Amino acid sequence: MANIEIPYGKSKLAFDLPDERIQGILRSKAGSYKVNMSEEDIVKRALENPIGTKRLQDLAEGKKNIVIITSDHTRPVPSRITLPLLLDEIRKKNKSANVKILIATGFHRGTTLQEMKAKFGEDLVENEQFVVHDSRNSENMELIGTLPSGGKLEINKLAVEADLLVAEGFIEPHFFAGFSGGRKSILPGIASVQCILANHCSEFIKNPYARTGVLENNPIHRDMIYAAKKANLAFILNVVIDSSHKIVNAFAGHSEKAHLKGCEFVSEIATVNAKPADIVITSNGGYPLDQNIYQSVKGMTAGEAACKDGGVIIIAAECADGHGGEGFYRWFKESKDPQDVMNKILSRGRDETLPDQWEAQILARILINHKVIMVTDSKNYEYVKDMFMTPAKDLGEALKIAESIVNNDSKINVIPDGVSVIVREK
């Protein structure tokens, strides 16, 4: 008997599985990756040895208006560690620079003051200049080019007006951009809603290269790279974290070169080989990534990659924030089945993309080929049902439901943290 723990909200769900039922337990190697350095020292080492560019302190010398793009409340970037070190590096040769910290919300809701203090610490919030990006506020946007896809590249004016643009973030597998981090700080991070919608169109989401761990020929990534170049993103600090959100590696320097090095590292530790199973049990990595159903689609894509067609995906996600997007929810609430959702989305052109359409498209793709059971807070049960999934109170109940759909002795793949792995079929 194997005891399995799955991240769920700010805690974990534990359950036992007979050894003979387990086809594979698929984990990123990040959890076992050993570093004999403190998190601070890992970041300092990266800042002192930038990839493809000068040190940040040298780039900052003589600059008057510096903007640091950081991640919002939905991302587990350990900014309490990284931001002070970035600020210190900038101020080593430029104590008088005006530094603004721009929170990249992308298409998410704005980060609240309470969430800012929880993420960055009260001292930092009270003593530094923070600005929350609002993709819907057209007055704060500036047109700086046309994306390879044809969409208008509009980003926050603060970034355009900066004489040095820096970004921090983290690199993990991403379910349609290939990997997070790097260029994503610009698009979707600080882009306008119209720009984000064009980049996330149904044509691109459908593209077979718009998948986890894939950058080459990925049209979404191609747009993002262009956006970072046009925005003059001069320096990045991207970290890699384990399942406890501890820093295990860091990459700093040129926005594309440093990011690619980081992606290579993540690919090495995150790629798992799986034989598809009838049942897959996974999660969205716990808080803050499982705050809503919308975000939890990411974890489901790992389940999709490790599950047979017609199989069952069980995802544990607390979803304290509910469905996470009215537009996303309505795609399902107002459709007769997942195929109906997909047909409606694919009928929309590149310039007709609606808010949250991409997440609905990916969830519909999963639901067309698999049953999904969601272990979540009971307040979400109606949402889950409306979205053609089945709610369950715990993993035991979820497994019983799954076994009523497939055989009782079906093999099971377990992916404790679905957002941390790149699943490749054996």
Swiss-Prot record:
Disulfide bonds: none annotated. Homodimer. It catalyses: (S)-lactate = (R)-lactate. It is an enzyme of class 5 (isomerase). Was originally shown to use Ni(2+) as a cofactor, but in fact, the cofactor is a (SCS)Ni complex, a nicotinic acid mononucleotide derivative that is covalently attached to Lys-184 and forms a tridentate pincer complex that coordinates nickel through one metal-carbon and two metal-sulfur bonds. Its EC number is 5.1.2.1. Activation of the apo-enzyme requires the three accessory proteins LarB, LarE and LarC, that are involved in the biosynthesis of the nickel-pincer cofactor of LarA. This is Lactate racemase. Pfam families: Lar_N, LarA_C. Substrate binds at Q295, K298. The keyword Metal-binding applies. Its cofactor is Ni(II)-pyridinium-3,5-bisthiocarboxylate mononucleotide. One of its GO terms (molecular function) is lactate racemase activity. The keyword Secreted does not apply. Catalyzes the interconversion between the D- and L-isomers of lactate. Belongs to the lactate racemase family. Ni(II)-pyridinium-3,5-bisthiocarboxylate mononucleotide binds at D72, H73, T74, R75, K184, H200. The active site is at H108, H174. InterPro entries: LarA-like (IPR048068), LarA-like_C (IPR043166), LarA-like_N (IPR018657), LarA_C (IPR048520), Ni_dep_LarA (IPR047926). Keywords: Isomerase, Metal-binding, Nickel.
